[in-house]
Structures are given as structure tokens and as C-alpha cells.
Amino acid sequence: MFQSKNIKNFLKNRFRGFYPVVIDVETAGFDPYRDALLEIAIITLRMDDNGFLRIDNKLHFNIIPTPGLNIKKSALKFNKIDPYNPFRAAINERKAIKEIFNTVRLGIKKQSCSKAVVVAHNAYFDHSFLMSAVDRSKIKYNPFHSFSTFDTATLSGLVLGQTVLSKACIIAGIEFNNNYAHSALYDSKKTAELFCEIVNRWKKMGGWPIPKNRK
């Protein structure tokens, strides 16, 4: 895992000690406590020597629907997921969350950060499904902040005048193929590219770092 050698450009100094982790989930409905999680992907970020945010590591898991949770046909029609397809190579929810948390903890330690923070497009949705899965899995230590997030829908609305992921990416000059949309891995990658573009654009415009006399 790469870390900038320039102390001024350490990731921990950019987001008040938070370690940003891009997340996307695909689900069997909109209720994080009643509807099943079907797919989850994360992308960790790093900062290069020039202080620009870059994509680092990726993790993606297809999830076996947790017994007792709803699987709504309307959701499956939308995301085109067959939750019982054996070729999905799906794993149970708890195992996936533990693998993700192990990767995130290593990143937090490597980057000398204090806590991970979810970065997502319409972040409340992804954050709530993640937290619900953690509760069901009875995992004691959660490296993610319990409520703070970075929402790229809000950020892109401010910076680009668009809140839909595909439209925001196109305006930002990021290629987006709708044929691959609603895959957790693809959407997380595009969300990561969008977040990096917005953060880096702000830096290029002189918005970061903040002048010492304003700190």
C-alpha cells in the first residue's frame, strides 16, 4: 500500500484524520433492516507525493442473502441480480464484512488515520446497509464512523450541477457505461473516480491546502 513521502500530503492531514473508503452496495430492497444485502464493493484511497487523491485497493463480494430477510422482485429487476445463481461464488454476509474490515483496518494503520469514513453516492443508503450488516454479524469493532459520511451526490451537485452518478461522471470527464451500472464493483469504481476528481479539482483551484493564517 502506497503512502506519500511528503508529510504535508499525508492522507490523514486531508480529512481530519479520517480514512475515506468508497463503498457501493446492491440490495434486495430499500430497507436496511428487512431487505437482503446482495453485493458489496469497497475501494480504498491514497494520496500521492503531490497531494492528489488516487485509487488504491479494491474488494468485491457477492453475498448470500441472509435467511429471513426480504428479497423483492422489483429490486432484482432493477439490478439484474440472480441471488441464487451458483456462478456468483457468493459468501455469507459476516465473512464479507470481516474481510472488508481487515482491509480497512490495515489502511487506517498504514495511513496513520483514526477512523474510516464511508464515501458513497447517496451515502445514507450504503452506510445504513453497511451498519445493519455489521449489527447482524455481531462484529464488535467497527472501523467506520457511525454517522459521518462523504456523499458524492451532494458534492457533485455543488461542483458539477448534477446528482445522478452517470451524469456527474460525464460532466466531470469520467467515462461511464450504463451497461455496467448497478454492479457494486463498477459503481464503486466510478464513485471513487468522481470523489478523487472533485477533491483534486478543489486542490487545483487553490482550495487546499488552507493557508496557515486561516487555520
Swiss-Prot record:
Cofactor binding note of this UniProt entry: Binds two Mg(2+) per subunit. The active form of the enzyme binds two Mg(2+) ions in its active site. The first Mg(2+) forms only one salt bridge with the protein.
Gene name of the record: rnt
EC number: 3.1.13.-
Protein name as catalogued: Ribonuclease T
Cofactor(s) annotated in UniProt: Mg(2+)
HAMAP family linked to this entry: RNase_T (MF_00157)
InterPro entries on file: Exonuclease_RNaseT/DNA_pol3, RNase_T, RNaseH-like_sf, RNaseH_sf
Source species of the chain: Wigglesworthia glossinidia brevipalpis
GO cellular component terms attached to this protein's record: cytosol
Positions of Mg(2+) 2 binding: 24, 26, 182, 187
Family: Belongs to the RNase T family.
Superkingdom of origin: Bacteria
Protein function: Trims short 3' overhangs of a variety of RNA species, leaving a one or two nucleotide 3' overhang. Responsible for the end-turnover of tRNA: specifically removes the terminal AMP residue from uncharged tRNA (tRNA-C-C-A). Also appears to be involved in tRNA biosynthesis.
